[in-house]
A protein has these predicted regions:
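Low-complexity, acidic/polar, glycine-enriched regions of mature
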Residues: 1-179
């Protein structure tokens, strides 16, 4: 199968903050902490093949970031402790940058590798996500397990409560075609 790609198929999208979110879940010996942030910004740039798949060349680009102090669990005390752990005054944003993208096992699924920058440190993670698009927008959804120790962060221990260093992160990006 041969698919032709031309520059006309390259599309830039801007992340729509109101429709996009990052949800997180961390476990402790007492309970599960869940939270969400919606104030995401960023851009996605892809070249579409004629069959609606993302072309490997030129490589897709994606940059997304979010403000640490918009990460909310519904518990103000926990939120402030989380921001303090991340050192939100020195490192007010978390960023994600796509490095590689390859077609996955099923239509609309892709394997990705990218860098997450948290608390001033960048680490490479691999994952898989789904992509849906139409003429006006693109929607990307995926899940990733992040270990906060990779970023030099120590899981908090509050007397008898221990927090697991693994955090499950679910991402939903909705981005509108840029003019």
């Amino acid at each position: 199968v041969s698919v032709t790609v031309d520059a006309a198929n390259r599309v830039r999208y801007s992340v729509t903050p109101a429709d996009s979110s990052v949800e997180f879940e961390a476990r402790s010996t007492l309970h599960t902490v869940r939270g969400k942030v919606q104030d995401l910004t960023g851009s996605i740039e892809v070249t579409w093949n004629d069959d609606g798949t993302i072309a490997p060349e030129p490589p897709a680009k994606m940059h997304v970031d979010l403000p640490v102090e918009q990460m909310r669990s519904g518990n103000g005390l926990l939120d402030r402790e989380m921001w303090k752990l991340i050192d939100s005054k020195r490192f007010p944003r978390v960023a994600g940058d796509l490095r590689t993208l390859t077609p996955g096992p099923a239509a609309g699924r892709y394997a990705a590798s990218g860098d997450i920058t948290l608390a001033g440190r960048s680490r490479r993670y691999d994952g898989e996500f789904t992509v849906k698009h139409d003429d006006a927008c693109i929607t990307i959804e995926g899940e990733l397990n992040v270990d906060i120790r990779d970023f030099g962060l120590k899981p908090p221990n509050l007397v008898v409560i221990k927090v697991d260093p693994g955090v499950k992160v679910r991402v939903r990006l909705v981005a509108a075609r840029a003019a």
